[in-house]
């Protein structure tokens, strides 16, 4: 059995606006002394698998600064403080693509990287998505909206063309029929 570490303190290091960096100090009952660990407090975010009445999936393609290149993605973004995740899903789909559809259904909720991050990522399925609004991109966004068949999306994931791991997960939940949206259940949290 793995014993729980005891938190001895926390020190804020820097606030970058969209994320904060802190140093937490822990002690383990089987180890001597205390250890410091860096933790990233990022805002929680949502992902949206939007499916049209023709069963196509709404994808976006945009430049990603971390890798210095464009990437295929699904609509996603941060949850604003005080905003319910389900409302953020509807907003992000509308802002990034102009699409709207049926009420969101939960697909999955995950911890992006619990080794160093404290946030959650919640994914929703929106069925019967159609183009209904003008896009409302953030100042640093330039987005291409593309409809792909479910088979094309499967091939993109298999080939590595769709490489964003946290965005693959909700797509795979949808494409394989696992998760609350497939069974009618609710999110784990």
Where are these regions (language model features)?
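Acidic/glycine-rich phosphate/pyrophosphate-binding loops and surrounding catalytic core
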Residues: 100-113
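Nudix hydrolase/Nudix homology domain
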Residues: 2-5, 70, 81, 106, ...
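Beta-rich strand-turn-strand
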Residues: 82-87, 96-103
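Conserved Nudix-box catalytic region and its N-terminal flanking loop in Nudix hydrolases
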Residues: 2-4, 37-42, 47-91, 129, ...
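Short, well-ordered beta-strand micro-motif
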Residues: 23-25, 50, 125-127, 147-149, ...
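Active-site-adjacent beta-strand/loop module that shapes the phosphate/pyrophosphate-binding cleft
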Residues: 22-30, 113-132
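Acidic, metal-coordinating catalytic segment for phosphate/diphosphate chemistry
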Residues: 10-49, 53
């Amino acid at each position: 059995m793995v014993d729980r570490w005891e938190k001895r303190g926390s020190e804020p290091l820097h606030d970058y606006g969209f994320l904060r960096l802190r140093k937490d100090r822990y002690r383990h009952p089987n180890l001597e002394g205390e250890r410091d660990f860096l933790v990233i407090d990022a805002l929680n975010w949502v992902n949206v698998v939007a499916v049209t009445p023709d069963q196509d999936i709404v994808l976006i393609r945009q430049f990603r600064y971390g890798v210095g290149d464009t990437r295929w993605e699904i609509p996603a973004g941060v949850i604003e403080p005080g905003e319910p995740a389900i409302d953020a899903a509807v907003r992000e789909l509308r802002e990034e693509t102009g699409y709207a559809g049926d009420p969101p259904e939960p697909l999955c909720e995950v911890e992006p990287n619990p080794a160093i991050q404290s946030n959650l990522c919640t994914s929703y399925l929106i069925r019967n998505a159609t183009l209904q609004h003008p896009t409302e991109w953030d100042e640093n966004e330039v987005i291409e909206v593309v409809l792909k068949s479910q088979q094309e999306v499967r091939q993109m994931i298999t080939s590595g063309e769709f490489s964003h791991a946290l965005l693959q997960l909700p797509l795979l939940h949808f494409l394989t029929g696992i998760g609350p949206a497939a069974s009618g259940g609710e999110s784990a949290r």
